[in-house]
């Protein structure tokens, strides 16, 4: 690997350009396809010979993820939030699986691309904003008007609230992107150092221990970032439901 950032480069495998769209196959396309195969395959296996009592290990994992997401939705939004379960479940598995896939040596980290994380974040915010207008109508704009404020302060605070709302997808995207980027760069640097120090016999073992330790740390961060991404999405949904 010539460059530290080479692992984040997007390769073009097949050029497919129509009159209106560019649907060329890139590294991101391939990994998103693998994501679909992995997630669907995991749940196909978990549902194979599924039983109410007992079941296979994959069934237990599927049930644990299901219960985790349901509890998170109820905790943050309440029972009305169950309406969003399919979306939140898909979002959590999407981010988590892509994060974990990026930990495979010599693989590509899709969530280490700001374009991907920002597109995901802005799509979510546009979607829940449209949903907010659908359920509240014009009253949805009350979300930008703080209550119990002096009239002369209102224009400034409304401006701040609007800017805060507009910047939400940016903070959501950059948080995930920056954590994935920094973690993978750190592992890469330690890995290069480990390869160089292998010539010094026992001293060369220490960096590899660090690499393994950081891999486990990154695995935890992969789950944590998926959790935080979904948690913030649920908080935004709760704000729209309650208009605050």
From Swiss-Prot:
GO terms for cellular component: mitochondrial inner membrane; proton-transporting ATP synthase complex. Keywords: ATP synthesis, CF(0), Hydrogen ion transport, Ion transport, Membrane, Mitochondrion, Mitochondrion inner membrane, Transmembrane, Transmembrane helix, Transport. It holds the Pfam family ATP-synt_A. The keyword Membrane applies. It is a multi-pass membrane protein. InterPro entries: ATP_synth_F0_asu (IPR000568), ATP_synth_F0_asu_AS (IPR023011), ATP_synth_F0_asu_bact/mt (IPR045083), F0_ATP_A_sf (IPR035908). GO terms for biological process: proton motive force-driven ATP synthesis. It is found in: Mitochondrion inner membrane. Its main location: mitochondrion. NCBIfam families: ATP_synt_6_or_A, PRK05815.2-4. Mitochondrial membrane ATP synthase (F(1)F(0) ATP synthase or Complex V) produces ATP from ADP in the presence of a proton gradient across the membrane which is generated by electron transport complexes of the respiratory chain. F-type ATPases consist of two structural domains, F(1) - containing the extramembraneous catalytic core and F(0) - containing the membrane proton channel, linked together by a central stalk and a peripheral stalk. During catalysis, ATP synthesis in the catalytic domain of F(1) is coupled via a rotary mechanism of the central stalk subunits to proton translocation. This is ATP synthase subunit a. The gene is atp6.
